[in-house]
């Protein structure tokens, strides 16, 4: 058997291996032994090793013209050199090598086999086609790919990789080039191979210093994309260097590639060996000869690029010259073809569009300088679309790929021939002129690396310029100390999660794994705030990563966290329901790492209702800022709000809260938002969870900058944290950081995400953590020793192990039944809430003391006049009685805040807390001006809110928590609309104290009353609030007079009781003269009355029927009673619905010893209102009371009828039933 036909050019290697086999059979691999034993001779089937072909050699820059040669000097006798003589120049002529000794040497061994193969090759009738191909596009696109590889996975591609892949594609288009010739059974035969097996000609050094050529095969290349081809190519190369090629690697070559251009050869005709039909030779890359003396500037001006000469040597017996010529033309077209380069860029995950082959465009029409400026602006506005921000480097299935053709130079009528030309750039990068290549390099560095920035949508030019300058200046390299600090934070984040995973297997903790860069990011923002001399950072966040943040950012003791895992409650948590560990809050101090700053850090408690914490945290921050009262620039408490990507895009509370940012009653000087974008929501992918391209696209609607940052680049993450904090301080606006990362585990630690995201978790499983990657980077750069890296992790683990053991040794305390919070706070009984007559007059006079030149609106002036007179003459209505409470509290030095939709005027045109001059639009808040005149820091602040209940109520709740000494009231436009804030009511208002020990004195003012306005303007859902009442969690009231409302508000504000107050306020009663109060009700009546007995009972002994009622229905029943002259009926008003004033009710009932019937009369349907709650609890509290019967509308699914006549009929029937004999 001929080794030449099977192994081609590698036949010499077979001979060498066989000689080794003859000397020592064990010295060759098993495959070779089996082959030689089967063949029994040296010409058995060969095997090959291969080394990497060298890349085509680039020519140097054109050399300057050589100086004329000097005339030869006459030979003279040498003398000692003078000390001052100049040193002689060394000759630039290379020293001539010594010629070998003449003689004759027999050729043996390898070279004998090679010579034999060459003789055999002469039997093949070959022909050669030659083609010069433009190489400019290869230079540009190869550089783009290699830049991307340098920033991501490392490595590079060579020209030979590209040409080899183009060769495979061309063979696929011209399969005849893959054929070969052989003689089988004495007959000429055309061989058509099954696959395209590309042979790489590799020059291997031998032990004796000589070199030998082998050809190794990349098999089945037609099935590969470029990335696969590159991997197979590099595998062959790597194994050839290590001598690890197998016999199979040397066999089956169908076409070969050789690259003499690597040593500067421009054109060669390689030999074709038996068994192959084609061999391609690649020459060096150089400018055409006639331009090799031109300067770079001249070459750029002329648009001259380098060429590469490629030859196709083929077996003329099976391949015709036309086919070979077409083959080379196809290769040339591929190397300048858009789709070929698109395929390579896609396979290599290069986010940019490849450079395109194009003819040079003359500088006519629109000036090219203008086009370059347009390109710069395109990158500023859309460069983020191709930024390398996704650590998984993949496109989510179903998500459309954005169009970023604006970033292609071709879009701007620029071509590759413009890259080295100089253009005016208007100060970009601090220069007036640059080459297009320099411009692209700077633009990509600023806008397309690990940070993608969106800021050009911002309307304010100063903001845009500030951001532009910092982004285009680039990210400064951290110092070695800063790098070690970043690594320390990553170590802490990862070690904490690993420790919990090991010690508490299966317990839910919603780990941060995959997003550990959040810890250095938050630390960076807080550290920057500390350096700015600010007072506090308040954090709001969901449950994912919360434990890690509590420990590594807030500084919560490890022992406390471990105790929670052990089920042991801290002392402060005893009583109440408690909550899961990943809902709890805490606070600590942050010491600036590279400075002297120090700042308080607090984490707000939150429920699992995602994003519900947003408005609450903002309210807390605003309260703290108002308490510090540092003026316009005093927003020294920083809100830092964390989100999940799916929640941020999906939940309406997000834009509701962001919308508050620049409103005067809600501005907190900017919030730093971090979206922890792990690219999944539980099991839902982005294509099913948002219609926006980015989860953060809401932010742009509010004119805020967004920074998308790769979570696997901690240095970029830290820089963005600093930049965002600086922007917030400079411009007082919200700023958004989209931290693109992944979730290592499922939604919780017991979940298996591969069930729903198999492809995503193929990429995640086994992936190196960001800490490991960063450690390798620092080790590779020499910035850290391996010992230091290991010591940090070990010390951190030892610290946690020590605390863990202490907790374990402390022993588990036996769980105890929770006692509740009922006994911790009591209603104040002895507190007097009246004011003096002098203060009452002063409050009334405030509406007369208008600023000079101020005029009331014609419809408001009578209201102001009535308020001045009513404090002496009587007839104080509801709105004025309420304002008297707020104004008197502000007078005493308290901060009173009232906010809601239309609260300044009042939904029903009743309040007029702030008057507006119709001519000048000047505002006048009489009670605030009065409080300010006292000089005791009292304030009465009234704000119209945005049209939101959820965010509005949440903000006011947060405000009441952030400043417990303030009096905070949130008013609904109609009480019905409070259900838009049901999450705040359920999760915070009613249960915050029980779950987290978080107290609040928030007041909810909810207009409620059945006046025929329909099902959405009648009921504040009294039954729902009462259902939430337990353990004294809330005070719920429905006062019937302005004075009692006044006393209730003042009692709530002046007492030490810290619980929310829910008041169902009236609508029709606002102008009901029967419901007005006298001045003495504010000055002489000293307390709130939880129950008001019937004042119109002449003889209690005559009373046979007692009606229990609340709200405006009292006045309708009283009117009917008077009309009918019913002295056998007593109407008792329950003013406080919870806690149930059972003693006062019992006393009232006891005052009617002959009563035979107790009616509970209410406007609301039977299944709503106070009745269901009172039916259940009142008999338990008053065991001996007469049987109680309900009188109300029938049970309904809706709250009220929307038909006025039906409403009137229902009300008449209800009252008639109450007064039945």
UniProtKB/Swiss-Prot annotation:
Instruction: Identify the EC number(s).
Output: 1.2.4.2, 2.3.1.61
Q: Which reaction does it catalyse?
A: N(6)-[(R)-lipoyl]-L-lysyl-[protein] + 2-oxoglutarate + H(+) = N(6)-[(R)-S(8)-succinyldihydrolipoyl]-L-lysyl-[protein] + CO2; N(6)-[(R)-dihydrolipoyl]-L-lysyl-[protein] + succinyl-CoA = N(6)-[(R)-S(8)-succinyldihydrolipoyl]-L-lysyl-[protein] + CoA
**Chain intervals for the UniProt region annotation (2-oxoglutarate dehydrogenase E1, C-terminal part):** 338-1221
A single GO molecular-function term is: dihydrolipoyllysine-residue succinyltransferase activity
Q: Which UniProt keywords apply?
A: Acyltransferase, Magnesium, Metal-binding, Multifunctional enzyme, Oxidoreductase, Thiamine pyrophosphate, Transferase, Tricarboxylic acid cycle
Residue ranges under compositional bias (Polar residues)? 41-52
Region feature (Disordered): 22-107
- Residues that bind Mg(2+): 645, 678, 680
In terms of superkingdom, the source organism counts as Bacteria
Q: Which residues bind 2-oxoglutarate?
A: 583, 608, 1017
Gene Ontology CC annotations of this record: cytosol; oxoglutarate dehydrogenase complex
| One GO BP annotation of this record | tricarboxylic acid cycle
| Active site feature | 316
Q: What else is known?
A: Is non-lipoylated. In contrast, the E2 component AceF is the prominent lipoylated protein in C.glutamicum.
Q: How does it assemble?
A: Homodimer. Part of an unusual ODH/PDH supercomplex, consisting of AceE (E1), AceF (E2), and Lpd (E3) together with OdhA (E1+E2). Interacts with the FHA domain of unphosphorylated OdhI via its C-terminal dehydrogenase domain.
**According to its UniProt entry, what is the function of this protein?**
Catalyzes the E1 and E2 reactions as part of 2-oxoglutarate dehydrogenase (ODH) activity, to convert 2-oxoglutarate to succinyl-CoA and CO(2). OdhA has reductase activity with 2-oxoglutarate but does not react with pyruvate, and also displays transsuccinylase but no transacetylase activity. Since OdhA is not lipoylated, the succinyltransferase activity of its E2 domain is dependent on lipoyl residues of the acetyltransferase AceF.
From the Swiss-Prot or TrEMBL record, give the protein name. Answer: 2-oxoglutarate dehydrogenase E1/E2 component
Organism per entry = Corynebacterium glutamicum (strain ATCC 13032 / DSM 20300 / JCM 1318 / BCRC 11384 / CCUG 27702 / LMG 3730 / NBRC 12168 / NCIMB 10025 / NRRL B-2784 / 534)
Gene from which the chain derives: odhA
């Amino acid at each position: 058997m001929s080794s030449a036909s099977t192994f081609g050019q590698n036949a010499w290697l077979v001979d060498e291996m066989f000689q080794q086999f003859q000397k020592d059979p064990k010295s060759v691999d098993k495959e070779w032994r089996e082959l030689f034993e089967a063949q029994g001779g040296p010409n058995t089937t060969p095997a090959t090793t291969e080394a990497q072909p060298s890349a085509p050699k680039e020519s140097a820059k054109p050399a300057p013209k050589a100086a004329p040669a000097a005339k030869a000097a006459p030979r003279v006798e040498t003398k000692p050199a003078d000390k001052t003589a100049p040193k002689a120049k060394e000759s630039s002529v290379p020293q001539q090598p010594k010629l070998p000794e003449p003689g004759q040497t027999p050729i043996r061994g390898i070279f004998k086999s090679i010579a034999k193969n060459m003789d055999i090759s002469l039997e093949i009738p070959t022909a050669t086609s030659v083609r010069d191909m433009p190489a400019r596009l290869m230079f540009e696109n190869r550089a783009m790919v290699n830049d991307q590889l340098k920033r991501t996975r490392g490595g590079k591609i060579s020209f030979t990789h590209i040409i080899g892949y183009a060769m495979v594609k061309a063979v696929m288009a011209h399969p005849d080039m893959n054929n070969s010739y052989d003689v089988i059974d004495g007959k000429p035969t055309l061989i058509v191979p099954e696959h395209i097996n590309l042979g790489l000609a590799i020059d291997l050094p031998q032990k004796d210093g000589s070199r030998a050529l082998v050809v190794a095969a990349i098999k089945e290349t037609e099935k590969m994309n470029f990335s696969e081809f590159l991997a197979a190519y590099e595998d062959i190369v790597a194994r050839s260097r290590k001598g690890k090629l197998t016999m199979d690697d040397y066999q089956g070559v169908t076409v070969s590639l050789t690259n003499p251009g690597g040593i500067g050869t421009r054109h060669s005709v390689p030999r074709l060996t038996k068994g192959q039909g084609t061999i391609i030779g690649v020459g060096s890359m150089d400018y055409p000869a006639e331009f090799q003396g031109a300067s770079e500037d001249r070459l750029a001006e002329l648009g001259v690029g380098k060429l590469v000469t490629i030859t196709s040597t083929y077996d003329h017996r099976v391949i015709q010259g036309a086919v070979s010529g077409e083959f080379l033309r196809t290769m040339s077209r591929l190397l300048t073809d858009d789709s070929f380069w698109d395929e390579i860029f896609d396979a290599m995950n290069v986010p940019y569009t490849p450079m395109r082959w194009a003819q040079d465009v003359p500088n006519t029409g629109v000036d090219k300088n203008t086009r370059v400026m347009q390109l710069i602006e395109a990158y500023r506005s859309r460069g983020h679309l191709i930024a390398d921000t996704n650590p998984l480097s993949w496109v989510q299935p179903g998500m459309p790929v954005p169009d970023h053709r604006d970033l292609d130079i071709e879009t701007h009528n620029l071509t590759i021939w413009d890259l080295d030309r100089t253009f005016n750039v208007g100060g970009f990068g601090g220069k007036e002129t640059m080459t297009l290549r320099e411009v692209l390099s700077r633009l990509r560095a600023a806008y397309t690396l690990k940070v993608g920035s969106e800021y050009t949508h911002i309307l304010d030019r100063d903001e845009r310029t500030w951001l532009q300058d910092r982004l285009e200046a680039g990210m400064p390299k951290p110092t070695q100390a800063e790098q070690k600090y970043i690594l320390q934070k990553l170590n802490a984040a990862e070690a904490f999660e690993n420790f919990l995973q090991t010690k508490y297997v299966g317990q839910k903790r919603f780990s941060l794994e995959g997003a550990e860069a959040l810890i250095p990011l938050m630390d960076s923002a807080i550290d920057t705030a500390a350096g700015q001399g600010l007072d506090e950072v308040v954090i709001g966040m969901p449950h994912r990563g919360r434990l890690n943040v509590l420990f590594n950012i807030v500084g919560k003791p490890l022992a406390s966290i471990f105790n929670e895992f052990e089920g042991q409650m801290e002392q402060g948590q005893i009583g109440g329901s408690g909550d899961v560990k990943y809902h709890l809050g805490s606070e600590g101090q942050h010491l600036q790492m590279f400075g002297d700053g120090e700042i308080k850090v607090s984490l707000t408690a939150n429920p699992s209702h995602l994003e519900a914490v947003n408005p609450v945290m903002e309210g807390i921050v605003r309260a703290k800022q108002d308490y510090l009262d540092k003026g316009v620039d005093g927003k020294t408490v920083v809100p830092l709000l964390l989100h999940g990507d799916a929640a941020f895009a999906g939940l309406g509370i997000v834009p509701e809260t962001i919308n508050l940012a620049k409103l005067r009653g809600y501005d907190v000087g900017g919030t730093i938002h971090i979206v922890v974008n792990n690219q999944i929501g539980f099991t839902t992918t982005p294509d099913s969870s948002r219609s926006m391209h980015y989860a953060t696209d809401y932010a742009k609607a509010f004119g805020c900058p967004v920074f998308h940052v790769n979570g696997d680049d901690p240095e970029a993450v830290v820089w963005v944290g600093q930049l965002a904090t600086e922007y917030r301080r400079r411009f007082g606006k919200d700023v958004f950081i989209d931290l693109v990362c992944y979730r290592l585990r499922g939604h919780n630690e017991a979940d298996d995400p591969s069930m729903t995201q198999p492809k995503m978790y193929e990429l995640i499983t086994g992936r190196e953590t960001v800490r490991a990657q960063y450690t390798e980077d620092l080790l590779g750069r020499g910035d850290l020793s391996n010992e230091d890296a290991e010591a940090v992790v070990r010390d951190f683990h030892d610290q946690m192990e020590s605390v863990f053991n202490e907790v374990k040794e402390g022993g588990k305390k036996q769980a105890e039944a929770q006692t509740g919070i009922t006994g911790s706070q009591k209603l104040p009984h002895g507190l007097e809430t009246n004011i003096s007559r002098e203060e009452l007059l002063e409050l009334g006079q405030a509406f007369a003391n208008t600023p000079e030149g101020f005029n009331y609106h014609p419809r408001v002036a009578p209201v102001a006049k009535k308020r001045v007179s009513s404090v002496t003459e009587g007839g104080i209505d509801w709105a004025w009685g309420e304002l008297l409470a707020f104004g008197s509290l502000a007078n005493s030095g308290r901060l009173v805040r009232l906010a809601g939709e239309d609260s300044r005027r009042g939904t029903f045109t009743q309040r007029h807390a702030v008057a507006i001059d119709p001519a000048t639009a000047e505002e006048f808040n009489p009670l605030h001006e009065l409080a300010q005149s006292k000089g005791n820091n009292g304030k009465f602040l009234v704000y119209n809110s945005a049209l939101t209940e959820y965010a509005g109520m949440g903000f006011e709740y947060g405000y009441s928590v952030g400043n417990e000494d303030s009096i905070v009231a949130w008013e609904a436009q109609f009480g019905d609309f409070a259900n838009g804030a049901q999450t705040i009511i359920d999760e915070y208002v009613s249960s915050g104290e029980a779950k987290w020990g978080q107290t609040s004195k928030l007041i909810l003012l909810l207009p409620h009353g059945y006046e025929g306005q329909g099902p959405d303007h009648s009921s504040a859902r009294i039954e729902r609030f009462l259902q939430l009442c337990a353990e004294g969690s809330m005070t719920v009231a429905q006062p019937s007079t302005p004075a009692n409302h006044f006393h209730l508000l003042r009692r709530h504000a002046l007492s030490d009781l810290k619980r929310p107050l829910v008041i169902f306020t009236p609508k029709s009663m606002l102008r009901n003269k029967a419901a007005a109060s006298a001045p003495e009700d504010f000055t002489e009546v000293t307390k709130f009355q939880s129950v008001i007995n019937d004042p119109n009972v002449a003889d209690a002994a005559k009373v046979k029927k007692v009606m229990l009622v609340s709200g405006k229905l009292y006045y309708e029943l009283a009117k009917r009673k008077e009309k009918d002259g019913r002295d056998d009926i007593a109407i008792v008003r329950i003013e406080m619905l919870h806690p149930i004033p059972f003693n006062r009710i019992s006393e009232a009932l006891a005052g009617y010893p002959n009563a035979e019937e107790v009616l509970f009369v209410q406007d609301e349907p039977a299944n709503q209102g106070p009745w269901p709650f009172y039916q259940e609890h009142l008999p338990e509290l008053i065991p001996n009371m007469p049987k109680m019967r309900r009188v109300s509308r029938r049970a309904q699914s809706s709250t009220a009828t929307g038909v006025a006549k039906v409403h009137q009929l229902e009300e008449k029937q209800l009252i008639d039933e109450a007064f039945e004999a």
